[in-house]
Amino acid sequence: NQNYKLRTHVSFLPSKNEYQNFGIMQAMDILNAIFYIKENSPFKLMGGGIRTILFGNSYGGYLANLCAKIAPWSIDFILDNSSFVNLFGNIFRLIGFGKEIDFTRYHGTYDDTLFKNIFLYLSDKTYWNNNKFSKKYFSNARKIIREPLNKEHLIIQSLYPNPKYILYHSIFDERSPFENKENFVHILKELNFKV
């Protein structure tokens, strides 16, 4: 059958043997860059007090919110357009281990145009798995540390100087549910964040 497409899976292997840690290391990289810039020339020579504004769309907005969760005192403003604020639904597939369950449903992305008769499902290399007996198990603790929308964590975050938030999100967003962002904003306001 000339129209047949073989369904197969490929994992991306980064050149430095890294893995998709989904947010934590990227947020730490951003924060380390902010701390370095604030402590070194030419910004230090300017008398300090330079505002730190993080902005992003989708995953970039997620990283901005995650930076504010990790080090709220270091960020003055968050400008977020359509980020996700929790690992809702099957978004765990982006961490890479969804392929263990069913690579045709829980993949990072796919390509069905590169080859005529091959449908490629693609995932990142991952450190994590869904085996509860493994030291690499993606536990609830490892999940919630990556979620800006966690009320317990937001309560702790509210005890520190924290950023002002400007958040945009379409009610028609099919990738990241508007209701999640609405809940995030509600909790931020409840805890007296400036939104």
Please state what every model-predicted region is:
Residues 2-44:
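Alpha/beta-hydrolase active-site loop
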Residues 30, 57-59, 143-147:
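A short linear-motif detector with a strong N-terminal bias
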Residues 36-101:
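Primarily recognizes the serine-hydrolase "nucleophile elbow" in alpha/beta-hydrolase
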Residues 31, 65-69, 182:
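Short, hydrophobic alpha-helix immediately C-terminal to the catalytic nucleophile
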Residues 3, 50-53, 136-140:
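N-terminal start-of-chain detector that recognizes signal peptides
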Residues 103-195:
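Serine-hydrolase catalytic core
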Residues 18-25, 47-55, 169-176:
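Conserved aromatic-histidine-acidic binding/catalytic patches
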